[in-house]
Regions:
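Conserved alpha/beta core of the MobA/IspD/sugar-nucleotide pyrophosphorylase nucleotidyltransferase superfamily
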Residues: 2, 6, 150, 154-194
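N-terminal glycine-rich phosphate-binding loop and ensuing alpha1 helix
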Residues: 2-52, 59
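Short glycine-rich anion-binding loops that position phosphate/pyrophosphate groups of nucleotides
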Residues: 12-14, 54, 75, 105-108
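Short aromatic/basic micro-patch
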Residues: 25, 109, 143, 183-184
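Hydrophobic residues at beta-strand termini and immediately following loops
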Residues: 26, 70-72, 132, 175, ...
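Conserved N-terminal catalytic core of the sugar/cofactor nucleotidyltransferase
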Residues: 33-99
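Conserved beta-loop-beta/alpha segment of the NTase-like Rossmann-fold superfamily
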Residues: 76-146
Length: 194
């Protein structure tokens, strides 16, 4: 099977939190470093981190890790521009990628095991989309097979993965990720997980 890469979206300005959540410490490392390390452990290749606000600090925090940083100057436009930026970078590094996982950086319980399970579902289910299920919804991370790269590259505004999951429900396999409901947007969220 062709390689599966990952795009980790880390461009936001964490407006509700008031400081870069990408750099919050959880389990002895930053949230972003945790997700990067789990992606590397799962043998996802390449690992592309999309930055925007706080680009310099985020780049510095990942020094020494074998990742590619893709800066999105249009980060304030929403998630779609980050996905497009990451996909362009990923395909320049791995033109024959069979799939890409789009991940956010504020789900502290993401694991290499979850990433591996998504890749396995992609390989065995016959489906080209693999989404995580939690709290009665489908959400991130989401794996997109290469047949969806063209559609991904046309996303705009605040559109993210959910748009495609709704448009192509017959092509979606799911992986349970109950901890996916837990993400960090506020100080209260952070206190709850510590």
């Amino acid at each position: 099977m062709d390689k599966t890469g990952v795009i980790i979206l880390a461009a936001g300005d964490s407006s509700r939190l008031g400081r870069p959540k990408q750099l919050l410490t959880f389990g002895g490392k930053t949230l972003l470093a945790h997700i990067v390390d789990e992606a590397l452990e799962a043998s996802l290749d390449p690992v592309v981190v999309v930055t925007g606000a706080y680009a310099a600090a985020i780049g510095e925090s990942l020094k020494g890790r074998p990742v590619t940083i893709a800066h999105n100057p249009r980060w304030a436009e929403g998630m779609a521009s980050g996905i497009v930026t990451g996909l362009i970078e990923l395909l320049s590094l791995q033109p024959s990628a069979g799939g890409v996982i789009v991940s956010v950086c504020d789900q502290p319980y993401l694991s290499a095991g979850l990433f591996r399970e998504m890749v396995q579902q992609f390989g065995t289910s016959g489906k080209s989309l693999v989404a995580c299920s939690y709290g009665g919804i489908l959400g991130t991370p989401v794996l997109f097979g290469s047949r969806y790269f063209g559609v991904l590259s046309t996303l705009s505004g605040t559109q993210g993965a959910k748009k495609l999951l709704k448009e192509y429900p017959q092509d979606v396999a799911t992986v349970p990720f109950p901890e996916g409901e837990i993400d960090i947007d506020t100080e209260e969220d952070l206190k709850r997980i510590k």
